[in-house]
């Protein structure tokens, strides 16, 4: 009798376990239906090319809690510091005229000036960014966060925007009075003496 009762208990327990497993499948389905993957932060990207059309890197923009994260990667450049800015027009034409000055032509001049240059002097343009350091191996990597513009500011206006790597370092208009008693001149306040335009990418 005891053995029969034990077998009955085992069979009953097994039935309950199997019933529980069958119900578990439904629960999993409910979890799958109600769980949603978090949406990716809005972002944009620019592929950097030199005047010959060769790709030299990229710059990505994404929204983060503190503002806009900017991540720049370059390769194949000479070691040293390079000026890095967002320009006001989304055109990267290798031989073009500057907006409003058709008599002046050069590499990527169609990208216009720095984003926000009409509202402030360098280094307080909205498009001004920290300098990009390229190592002895010819590669450079920069991550920074700015609250001067959002991703939509770069792509939502009619003429877009572009990222520019300049041929030299940006002094951010930091010219001590012992060198220039009158302070930085107009050219320095415009570009930080970063030199010509080396590579450009339209923000998309």
Predicted regions and their residues:
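N-terminal leader/targeting pre-sequences
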Residues: 2-5, 11-14, 22-81, 86-204
């Amino acid at each position: 009798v005891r053995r029969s009762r034990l077998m009955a208990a085992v069979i009953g327990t097994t039935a309950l376990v199997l019933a529980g497993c069958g119900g578990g499948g439904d629960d999993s389905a409910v979890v799958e239906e109600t769980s949603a993957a978090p949406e990716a932060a809005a972002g944009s990207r620019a592929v950097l090319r030199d005047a010959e059309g060769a790709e030299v890197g990229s710059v990505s923009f994404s929204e983060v809690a503190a503002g806009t994260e900017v991540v720049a990667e370059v390769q194949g450049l000479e070691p040293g510091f390079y000026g890095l800015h967002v320009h006001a027009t989304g055109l990267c034409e290798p031989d073009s005229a500057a907006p409003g000055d058709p008599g002046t032509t050069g590499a990527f001049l169609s990208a216009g000036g720095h984003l926000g240059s009409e509202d402030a002097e360098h280094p307080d343009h909205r498009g001004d960014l920290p300098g990009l350091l390229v190592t002895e191996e010819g590669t450079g990597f920069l991550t920074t966060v700015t609250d001067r513009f959002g991703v939509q500011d770069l792509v939502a206006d009619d003429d877009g925007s572009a990222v520019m790597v300049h041929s030299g370092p940006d002094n951010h208009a930091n010219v001590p009075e012992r060198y220039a008693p009158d302070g930085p001149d107009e050219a320095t306040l415009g570009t930080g003496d970063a030199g010509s335009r080396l590579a450009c990418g339209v923000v998309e």
